[in-house]
């Protein structure tokens, strides 16, 4: 697109879509007009991509995920289309600042954490690699909550990201599908509940979003389902004065896609989550099968044309639902239906936490999905017969492997269902996959070893380096050209530049400029003043005990105590510790940890003894846009989970790409990162996964309290209400978790080792040349952790799919709006 045509499209959309002259348009109006102009360009390539897929009929990937943490789209699309300079120039001629327009776009409220961000990275890579793909998810009205901090506490507010319609979405009402549940929805005691009143039809309306591959050659689709009722309005109820009853069914149906992860502390929340998962599966499979049959697919070729990836256990009901479609809809026999189901489905496990391995009460299935539970029972009967034949007289093993858990509540084990009903189960880091095979899923790995694989996670360098850190991206491109953008391993040739004093100096300039820029944003957005010359240390991720934000804060208390005792003579650099992340609304201890972090920050800020040497900040409402701001400024990345509990992690990879040095345990993908860059370029500490497991029977946190003076001093500061700020005893549950209840996540066991690692960090930081050598090596040796590498592994080893690039003829058809079906009929005749 040349600048003149782009300018014409921008002005046209501003005037004709929004009915505004340029002089009266605000930033949001201009953002919408610019988005529409860019979408015009994307639309041609989107149609061309669909035309190529329809004509060539390649095997397609269908990615099912409850969440997609997309962030903002305009900046990424401009980068992928390679038109940001032209757009910026066009706007500057009109006195418009592109960066201001970019700031008006809200982060899409479609995800929460690593699971959703991984899904978004994978979609980016699938489009860049030109692999035919449709992502399926739910169209949340509010998504995850918006986090505010009040008096140190997390407060949840609705995230009304759709206050104004999202210009990237296209509602496809003609493509709507119906999902039936064998119960009614009713409103009772403030929530949505199920009752065995009647069969209820739910209508799923798809909202399509473009997924633009780098270079803009392929544009795949993310299809999100919004729930509503087929009967929007009951006129009879309205005419009788029951105005709520007139829209009762519509409101209850729409609640299904109102928020991401309803609070499961209540029965209403659990019912809603259960129906959300089924709604995603039912709508997506109906759409997949409709497309498969529409393009002439025979049932026997389903697995040759369709690869369905289950992103965690949330879509695991796909096993029973696909069997229902094949048995009841296609009228196939059991054996053929089962073979097709297993060959079509693949499952990614994302956790080692027992509480995160989903289970749904059988009574919910019996109430809402009676046919599906019949099928699950039959799958279980046949599978357990195979287990019994393989391991006779091992009744305990049979009970563990059953799809049905009998106690304490009869429930369907969704992980077991996903494993048995899929041809592939993969972990997301080498250690995670090994622990799945040897611990968590050991029985299944012994029974079905050929189904277990590893695919270490990755992140897209387009968003997390090219667009998030343009200064560093330019430095890399000046050195080796742009090839690294689509093949991150090419950065490896830059490793010798770690010894080049000139390159190190330019690298430091880029980092310092990013720190100054981030500091300025903190001042303007949050009113916080930080020293850009201090060491910037980040722990940004979901707040959870196993991720050990508490370990980080305990070290900060040790550092605080040292600085108070040693005064002006204390060694080491000034340090700023940043925290960010959300706690689940029902997770009381995680919310208390947020309170502790904020109270510690306030006390340190007010203490003149450490002013200018130590600062702590909690950044509220962590999201993709905030991550993009802070990553370029990062110098230390905290990856300090209890070993054996982090499946992979992806923030660790983003920090590595941006030149931060990792302080970490030997857990998740951090192990592989250290192998790639060399352990000498990391600050590794703490117990290994084997040591954590081996210490369960004898570990005593009181020993560390008694024998480690600095640990005792830190805990005594908390116990002595030094940080309670008028609420004596407020942090007693944290002390109880550490000392009374056994310190399950081994904070005190690792505290001394962690403190030594942090001392090494401080000492190295004083030698900026040595620090920069390590930082450069981290960046240039991060190539393995591109999501392009991960997706290629899935494509070759699990899905059996190949790229399908659109041809020039397809792009021409996209420009003309000619359909693929029309071109096919013209070539092949009636």
Model-derived features with residue positions:
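A conserved ligand/cofactor-binding region detector
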Residues: 1-818, 824
């Amino acid at each position: 697109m040349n600048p003149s045509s782009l300018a014409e499209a921008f002005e046209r959309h501003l005037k004709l879509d929004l009915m505004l002259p340029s002089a009266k348009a605000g930033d949001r109006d201009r953002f919408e007009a610019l988005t529409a102009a860019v979408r015009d360009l994307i639309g041609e390539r989107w149609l061309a991509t669909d035309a190529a897929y329809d004509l060539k009929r390649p095997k397609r990937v269908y990615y099912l995920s409850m969440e997609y943490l997309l962030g903002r789209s305009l900046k990424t699309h401009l980068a992928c289309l390679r038109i940001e300079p032209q757009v910026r120039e066009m706007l500057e001629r009109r006195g418009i600042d592109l960066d201001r327009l970019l700031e008006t776009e809200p982060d899409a409220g479609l995800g929460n954490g690593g699971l959703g961000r991984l899904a978004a990275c994978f979609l980016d890579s699938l489009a860049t690699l030109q692999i035919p793909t449709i992502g399926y998810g739910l169209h949340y009205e509010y998504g995850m909550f918006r986090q505010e901090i009040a008096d140190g506490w997390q407060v949840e507010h609705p995230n009304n990201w759709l206050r104004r319609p999202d210009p990237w979405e296209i509602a496809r009402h003609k493509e709507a599908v119906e999902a039936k549940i064998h119960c009614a929805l009713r409103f009772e005691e403030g929530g949505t509940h199920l009752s065995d009143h009647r069969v209820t039809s739910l209508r799923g309306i798809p909202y399509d979003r473009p997924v633009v591959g780098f270079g803009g050659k392929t544009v795949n689709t993310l299809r999100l389902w919004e729930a509503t009722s087929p009967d929007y309005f009951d006129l009879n109820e309205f005419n009788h004065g029951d105005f709520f009853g007139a829209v009762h069914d519509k409101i209850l149906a729409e609640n299904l896609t109102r928020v991401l992860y309803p609070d499961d502390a209540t029965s209403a929340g659990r019912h809603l989550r259960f129906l959300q998962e089924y709604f995603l599966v039912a709508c997506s499979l109906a759409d997949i099968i409709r497309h498969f049959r529409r393009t002439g697919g025979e049932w026997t070729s389903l697995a040759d044309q369709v690869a369905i990836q289950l992103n965690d256990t949330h879509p695991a009901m796909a096993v029973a639902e696909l069997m229902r479609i094949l048995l009841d809809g296609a009228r196939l026999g059991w054996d053929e239906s089962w073979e097709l189901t297993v060959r079509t489905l693949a499952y990614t496990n994302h956790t080692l936490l027992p509480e995160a391995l989903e289970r749904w009460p059988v009574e919910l299935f019996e109430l809402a999905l009676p046919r599906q539970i019949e099928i699950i029972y039959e799958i279980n009967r046949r599978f357990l017969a195979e287990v019994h034949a393989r391991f006779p007289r091992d009744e305990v093993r049979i009970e563990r492997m059953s799809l049905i858990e009998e106690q304490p509540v009869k429930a369907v084990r969704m992980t077991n269902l996903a494993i048995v009903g899929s041809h592939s189960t993969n972990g997301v880091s080498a250690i995670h996959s090994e622990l799945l095979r040897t611990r968590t899923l050991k029985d299944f790995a012994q029974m079905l070893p050929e189904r277990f694989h590893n695919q270490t996670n990755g992140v897209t360098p387009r968003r997390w380096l090219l667009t998030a850190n343009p200064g560093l991206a330019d430095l890399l491109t000046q050195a080796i050209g742009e090839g690294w953008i689509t093949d991150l391993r090419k950065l490896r040739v830059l490793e010798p530049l770690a010894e080049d004093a000139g390159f190190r100096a330019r690298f430091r300039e880029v980092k310092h400029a990013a720190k100054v820029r981030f500091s300025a944003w903190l001042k303007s957005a949050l009113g916080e003043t930080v020293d850009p010359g201090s060491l910037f240390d980040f722990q940004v991720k979901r707040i959870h005990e196993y991720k050990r934000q508490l370990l980080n804060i305990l070290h900060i208390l040790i550092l605080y105590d040292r600085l108070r005792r040693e005064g002006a003579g204390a060694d080491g650099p000034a340090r700023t510790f940043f925290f960010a992340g959300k706690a689940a609304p029902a997770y009381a201890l995680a919310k208390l940890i947020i309170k502790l972090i904020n109270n510690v920050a306030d006390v340190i800020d007010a203490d003149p003894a450490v002013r200018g040497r130590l600062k702590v900040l909690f950044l509220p409402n962590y999201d993709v846009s905030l991550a993009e701001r802070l990553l370029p400024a990062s110098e230390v990345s905290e990856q300090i989970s209890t070993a054996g509990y982090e499946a992979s992690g992806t923030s660790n990879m983003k920090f590595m790409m941006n030149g931060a040095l990792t302080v970490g345990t030997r857990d998740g993908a951090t192990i592989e990162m250290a192998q790639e860059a060399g352990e000498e370029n990391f600050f590794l500490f703490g117990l290994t996964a084997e040591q954590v497991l081996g210490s369960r029977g004898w570990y005593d946190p009181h020993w560390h309290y008694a024998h480690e003076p600095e640990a005792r001093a830190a805990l005594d500061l908390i116990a002595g209400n030094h940080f309670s700020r008028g609420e004596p005893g407020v942090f007693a549950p944290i002390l109880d978790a550490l000392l009374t209840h056994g310190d399950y996540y081994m904070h005190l066991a690792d505290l001394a080792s962690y403190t030594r690692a942090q001392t090494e960090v401080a000492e190295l930081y004083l030698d900026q040349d040595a620090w920069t050598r390590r930082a450069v090596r981290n960046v240039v040796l991060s190539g393995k952790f591109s999501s392009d590498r991960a997706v290629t592994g899935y494509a070759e080893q699990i899905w059996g799919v190949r790229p399908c690039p659109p041809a020039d003829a397809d792009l021409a058809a996209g420009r003309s709006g000619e359909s693929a079906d029309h071109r096919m009929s013209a070539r092949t005749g009636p």
